[in-house]
Amino acid sequence: MTETKEERVHQVFEKIYKRYDVMNSVISFQRHKAWRKDTMKRMNVQEGQSALDVCCGTADWAIALGKAVGPTGHVEGLDFSENMLSIGKKKIADERLDHVFLRHGNAMELPYADDTFDFVTIGFGLRNVPDYMQVLREMARVTKPGGKVVCLETSQPTIPVFKQLYFFYFRHVMPLFGKMFAKSYDEYSWLQESTLSFPGRDRLAQMFKEVGLTDVQVKPYSGGAAAMHLGVKESYDEESRNVTC
C-alpha cells in the first residue's frame, strides 16, 4: 500500500525528535533563532494575549510566545508527533511556563472553536502538511477577528548564483548532516524534498489572501532561504462594510 505524505512525515518526526533541535541549528547555521526573533518583533505580541503554535514540534516558538504573553496570557501548541511533544513538555516545565499547554492533534482539523486566538503561528511545519490550503483555512478560522496568522518557513531564493548553491545544499549537504548528526540520512532526505517542493513567497502570499487574510506582509531572510508571511483576519465590521460597498 502506498504511504501517504502524512504517514511519512509522522514517521520522520517520530524518529528524529531527539536530535531535532540540534539539527535545526546545524541546518540553518543558527539563523532560525534570529528569523523567529525578528518575526516575533513584527507580530507585536502583548502581555495577556493568546496564541496557538501549529506543528509546534519541540515547542521553541510556543515557549517564545509564552514569554511574550506573560502569565496573564495563554498559549497552546499542537503537533501530531507525540515524541516531539515529549521534548517540548520537558522544556516548558524547565521554563516554568504554567500558561503554555501542548496538545497532540492534527493541523488539518484544529480542535479549537472559531475566533479563539490573537495569534496563530506555524514555524517550519507548513511544508510538511498534506494540504497547505486546508491548514491555512483552519489557522484563519481559529484566529480572532483582527488577529494575525503567521508562517515562518524555508523559502526559495531568487538570486541566480545563491539559488543554485541553496538547492545544492538542500539536495546533497543537508542529508549528509542528517546522517552525521542525527543518524538519519533518509529522514533528512525527505525534509529537503518537502522544502524544494514548497510554494515560493509570492504564491504563499496569494494563498494567505485566498483564505481571507488581509494586509499580507512578506519578509525574506538570509537571501530568501527563509521567509515570514503575516496576514490579518478581517474584523466582522470590516467584512460587513465590504459586503455593503
Curated annotation (Swiss-Prot):
Pathway: Quinol/quinone metabolism; menaquinone biosynthesis; menaquinol from 1,4-dihydroxy-2-naphthoate: step 2/2. InterPro entries: MenG_heptapren (IPR014122), SAM-dependent_MTases_sf (IPR029063), UbiE/COQ5_MeTrFase (IPR004033), UbiE/COQ5_MeTrFase_CS (IPR023576). It catalyses: a 2-demethylmenaquinol + S-adenosyl-L-methionine = a menaquinol + S-adenosyl-L-homocysteine + H(+). It is an enzyme of class 2 (transferase). GO terms for molecular function: demethylmenaquinone methyltransferase activity. The keyword S-adenosyl-L-methionine applies. GO terms for biological process: menaquinone biosynthetic process; methylation. The gene is menG. S-adenosyl-L-methionine binds at residues 58, 79, 106-107. Methyltransferase required for the conversion of demethylmenaquinol (DMKH2) to menaquinol (MKH2). It comes from the Bacteria. This is Demethylmenaquinone methyltransferase. Belongs to the class I-like SAM-binding methyltransferase superfamily. MenG/UbiE family.
